[in-house]
Amino acid sequence: MDGRSMIPLKDIVPSAQTNIKTQFILLDKGRTATEGQNKTCLALVADETAAVHFQLWGDECDAFEPGDIIHLTNGIFSYNRKSLVLRAGKRGNIEKVGEFTMAYVETPNMSEIRWAPDPNNSKKYVHEAVISTHSRIFPPLA
């Protein structure tokens, strides 16, 4: 384990760096799609502070199920086809560390926020607007 502390989902921001260390519960999983040689699927994940869309690749699509608690190291939060997703990326790692027992919220969804470059620091992003309070891909059950 590296020395960095875990980041709550509400504190993640878009970045080209793979440095996100966090833990969340998988709430829902979309259809598996094939992009060239790669199999992908989108999931809705959350912790006690926020929710986000999480991109699973290849064998990860079959390895994780709703209810799994997942630990992510060296993750990246960036755009994939105009959609902001959290993912492990090439250097990241995800592993199941438990199941079912984790407090979570479904709002805000960090993937449903429009981000803009920080006028004071072009390497950082700031919230510009909320596109939707809930996931538009995984609507709330209520």
PLM feature spans:
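OB-fold nucleic-acid-binding modules
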Residues: 1-34, 81-142
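Short interface patches used for recognition in eukaryotic signaling and trafficking proteins
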Residues: 6-8, 51-58
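Hydrophobic residues positioned within well-ordered beta-strands of beta-sheet architectures
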Residues: 22, 43, 72-73
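OB-fold (S1/OB) nucleic-acid-binding surfaces
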Residues: 27-54
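Short coil/turn segments at secondary-structure boundaries
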Residues: 36-39, 56-59, 85, 89
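Short nucleic-acid-contacting surface segments enriched for D/E, G, S/T with interspersed K/R
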Residues: 58-74
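Short, charged beta-turn/beta-strand-edge "cap" motif at the junction between a beta-strand
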Residues: 75-81
